[in-house]
Amino acid sequence: MYDIVIRVPENEPVTGQLGNGIYIVGSGADSHIQLDADGISPRHCQLTVEDGGIKVMDLGSNTGTYLDGERLGVGAKEVLPGDEIRIG
């Protein structure tokens, strides 16, 4: 299990845990992690959680997905402990 903290502007942070699996993050009703904020696409990014760690991949969002301040390109990137993912 991996601990996560989700911060949406003008809202209190939400904490949770992710087990192995694939999670879609976005504003759409079918997203596993649903966020209601400006600049978030219905299917914004994907988190893949495995025993070896977490990977993040942008799903063609309009405003991008960032890992420690760098906009993601094509493909998945490994997320290390303490890294920050920003969407929108």
Residue ranges and their predicted role:
Residues 2-8, 12-88:
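Forkhead-associated
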